[in-house]
């Protein structure tokens, strides 16, 4: 049917999904199963944008959809094209924007299924010689200087917009596209690392053309660049000399969270460095932050919750079970997600299941695991079971997302640091009409903790420590605080005096009306 969906003009709160592994059973899920069983969960969770992975046809299921063979075909293992259209239409009726994970950075090297040697040569769509081979991915690299390649890829963008009514794209592997050596084994530390002889200017030209075409076809479409190098201008408007992406991912944020958890004791977390990393972005480019995506949960890596709790998750997630490692993990999981969202530039992303602390890692069926689907699924029963703690994390995430939408948190780009204490592991900042208070110290609580704040009345509207979120409940719910005047030279200061429990966070609202939905 003709597209009738009109996207709301609000910052994207993205729920990243893989249709095949979204089901509970140890098998490949379908578009129909996703529409009936998973889509309602996403709507209930409060996210406003759905990002679909692995849509383009790919021969090897374990590639996570990134080794594409047919760029114009939805993956047949998930169902028919009509099933995908029904999924998107249903999501639209629920108010969800639907984005597609678009793979234009390379193509599968398989010659029977893919484009390689399509006309008998290696260079019809790709570079000839060594440059046509991606050494890290064992795939073929497009030659973006060829008109037939530009026509092929640009028409592919329009095809998914027109035929399936996608609302935009996440462009995968942008770093690999724009550098001749694909950005491999390279550290980008200054502006001198950009715009030198290592740049593939043809690839940058293609990306600019793609953004122009997409926004001509759908002026309200969303395009997101996945780039780890920090190339300036990717998400700047073309009218200002940029390449036209609407957003770029803040990919340093999840890497920094993993580094903190792996390399530092809780009492040694460098709070100043954390604050810098959370806010390290250019003012002229919109960014989307996240604590973890599918990348952090792949085999060989671990989700944040599993890094924090580990094997204790198997035996100590009962609602009445008290375990110090579990308590620590649950507290930090909530705090990490809250501060990542609260400091996000212009959008936020979550990978399916991470909102309730899905255990373990993602491991697609392969020879090394006897072709098992055990870790290529989502165990929704964990969050449905009221006798386990997973549903408490899900409840917190629901209320956190609702708070961001109700208070239009990400509409306000200015994040104002009010107070930072590295020794005590305290960060306090203001955004919109909200004050966010974080005490990352693992064992020190602070009474009568004072910091300067705008004068007024403040009500606590979200508390990570609350029992309904799996916390010990050390604060009175919905308590109200008033600033006090401290006489100091050369001028007086308005101060808030608060109790800060160890390893906890809460949000204060500066108004007389309660903003909660």
For each predicted feature, which ranges?
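C-terminal accessory region downstream of the catalytic core in glycan-modifying enzymes
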Residues: 400, 450-484
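Substrate-binding/active-site clefts of carbohydrate-active enzymes
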Residues: 5-9, 18-199, 498
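Conserved alpha/beta catalytic core and glycan-binding cleft of carbohydrate-active enzymes
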Residues: 165-167, 182-376, 405-452, 457, ...
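C-terminal beta-strand-rich structural cap/linker in extracellular carbohydrate-active enzymes
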Residues: 478-517
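The feature marks proteins involved in alpha-glucan
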Residues: 1-14, 26, 472-480
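Active-site rim elements
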Residues: 22, 194-199, 319-329, 381-391, ...
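Conserved, mostly hydrophobic/aromatic
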Residues: 17, 42, 52, 71, ...
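Aromatic- and carboxylate-lined catalytic core of secreted/periplasmic carbohydrate-active enzymes
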Residues: 211-212, 218-219, 378-417, 502, ...
């Amino acid at each position: 049917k003709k597209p009738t969906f009109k996207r709301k003009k609000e910052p994207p709160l993205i729920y990243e999904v893989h249709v095949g592994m979204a089901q509970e059973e140890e098998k490949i899920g379908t578009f129909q199963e996703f529409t009936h069983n998973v889509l309602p969960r996403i709507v209930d969770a409060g996210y406003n944008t759905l990002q679909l992975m692995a849509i383009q046809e790919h021969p090897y299921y374990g590639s996570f959809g990134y080794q594409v063979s047919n760029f114009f075909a939805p993956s047949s293992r998930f169902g028919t094209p009509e099933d995908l259209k029904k999924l998107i239409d249903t999501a639209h009726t629920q108010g969800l924007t639907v984005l597609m994970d678009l793979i234009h950075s390379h193509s599968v090297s398989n010659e029977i299924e893919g484009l390689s040697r399509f006309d008998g040569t290696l260079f019809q769509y790709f570079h000839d010689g060594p440059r046509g081979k991606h050494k890290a991915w064992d795939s073929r690299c497009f030659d973006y200087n060829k008109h037939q390649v530009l026509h092929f890829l640009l028409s592919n963008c329009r095809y998914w917009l027109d035929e399936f009514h996608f609302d935009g794209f996440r462009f995968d592997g942008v770093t690999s596209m724009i550098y001749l050596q694909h950005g491999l084994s390279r550290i980008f530390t200054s502006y001198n690392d950009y715009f030198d002889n290592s740049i593939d200017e043809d690839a940058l030209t293609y990306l600019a053309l793609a953004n122009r075409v997409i926004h001509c076809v759908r002026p309200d479409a969303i395009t997101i660049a996945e780039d780890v190098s920090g190339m300036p201008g990717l998400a700047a408007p073309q009218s200002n000399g940029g390449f036209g992406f609407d957003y770029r991912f803040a990919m340093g944020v999840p890497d920094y969270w993993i580094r903190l958890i792996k390399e530092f004791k809780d009492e040694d977390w460098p709070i100043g460095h954390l604050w810098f990393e959370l806010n390290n972005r250019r003012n002229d480019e919109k960014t989307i932050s996240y604590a973890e995506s599918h990348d952090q949960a792949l085999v060989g890596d671990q989700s944040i919750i599993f890094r924090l709790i580990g094997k204790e998750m198997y035996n100590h997630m009962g609602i009445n079970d008290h375990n110090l490692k579990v308590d620590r993990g649950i507290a930090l999981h909530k705090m990490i997600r809250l501060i990542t969202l609260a400091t996000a530039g212009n959008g936020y992303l979550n990978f399916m299941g991470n909102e309730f602390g899905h255990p373990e890692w993602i491991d697609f069926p392969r020879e090394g695991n006897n072709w098992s689907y055990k870790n290529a699924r989502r165990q929704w029963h964990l969050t449905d079971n009221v006798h386990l703690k997973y549903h408490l994390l899900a409840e917190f995430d629901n209320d956190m997302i609702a708070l961001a939408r109700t208070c239009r948190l990400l509409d306000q780009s200015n994040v104002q640091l009010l107070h930072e204490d590295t020794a005590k592991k305290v960060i306090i900042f203001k955004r919109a009409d909200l004050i966010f208070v974080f005490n990352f110290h693992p064992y020190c609580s602070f009474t009568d903790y004072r910091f300067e704040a705008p004068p007024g009345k403040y009500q606590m509207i979200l508390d990570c420590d609350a029992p309904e979120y799996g916390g010990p409940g050390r604060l009175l719910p919905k308590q109200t605080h008033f600033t006090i005047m401290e006489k100091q030279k050369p001028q007086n200061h308005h101060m808030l005096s608060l109790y800060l429990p160890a390893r906890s966070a809460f949000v204060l609202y500066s108004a007389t009306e309660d903003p909660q939905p």
